[in-house]
Regions:
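Juxtamembrane non-transmembrane "cap" segments at the membrane-aqueous interface
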Residues: 131-155
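Alpha-helical transmembrane segments of multipass membrane proteins
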Residues: 22, 26-30, 56, 60, ...
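Alpha-helical transmembrane segments of integral membrane proteins
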Residues: 14-22, 48, 52, 71-76, ...
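Conserved small/polar residues in nucleotide/adenosyl-binding loops
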Residues: 182-188, 201
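Hydrophobic alpha-helical transmembrane segments
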Residues: 159-181
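Interfacial aromatic-anchored transmembrane helix boundaries in multi-pass membrane proteins
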Residues: 34-39, 79-107
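Short helix-perturbing small/polar motifs within transmembrane alpha-helices
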Residues: 28, 97-138
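Hydrophobic transmembrane alpha-helices
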Residues: 2-71, 75
Length: 201
């Protein structure tokens, strides 16, 4: 019995494949979404992360509950840490990695990855980390950010929005909405999906 329980907590090739596929899909969806909405600078600065969190929430919840084991929240954020390091600069890696660790810590405890509320909490942490990454470039990593060769105009725009409390609070507040979305729209399907995800099905 104990051996069976232990085996059930181990990652399988299928688990790794699910995480890999869903991370790739979420990355592609995010890039398409950002490309389509990138024309509006104000939207990109304030609402991009909120819209992405809303769109990607079902993918994230399905991935976490399908695997049902500790790790998906951290792995997803590690993916973004690597992407951010390549696209924005190595200085952003600790930001996303730290967010991933916090998100994964929020999932401590038995069966957390089968609890829609716990999964939702980890998702909003992840979304807030993304929403605040542009702020962190101005608040904490300004010198490293400038060293990447970013235009003065970009720095001025980010400084304008991310040093104004009302815009900072607006961006973070609207990003938290996906938690409510996840609670209200996904739980109705969880019991049906669980039977399909069961290893004994």
């Amino acid at each position: 019995m104990e051996n069976e329980k232990s085996t059930g907590n181990k990652y399988t090739v299928k688990d790794a494949a699910i995480i890999g596929i869903f991370c790739a899909v979420m990355f592609v969806v995010f890039m398409v979404y950002s490309t389509l909405t990138g024309a509006s600078l104000f939207y990109s600065m304030i609402f991009n992360a909120a819209g992405a969190a809303l769109i990607l929430a079902p993918f994230y919840v399905y991935m976490c509950m399908k695997v049902g084991k500790h790790g998906p929240a951290l792995v997803y954020n590690i993916m973004w840490a690597i992407i951010a390091g390549l696209m924005m600069g190595p200085f952003m890696i600790p930001w996303f990695l730290g967010g991933g660790i916090i998100a994964e810590l929020s999932m401590c405890g038995k069966n957390a990855y089968h609890d829609i509320k716990r999964v939702s909490i980890s998702w909003v942490i992840t979304a807030l980390v993304r929403a605040a990454h542009g702020m962190s470039e101005i608040w904490f990593f300004r010198d490293a950010f400038l060293a990447t060769g970013v235009s003065e105009q970009q720095v001025q725009v980010q400084t304008q929005y991310y040093t104004d409390p009302k815009y900072v609070l607006l961006s973070l507040a609207v990003t938290a909405i996906p938690v409510s979305y996840t609670h209200l729209t996904l739980p109705t399907n969880i019991s049906r999906c669980r039977s399909r995800w069961s290893p004994y099905h």
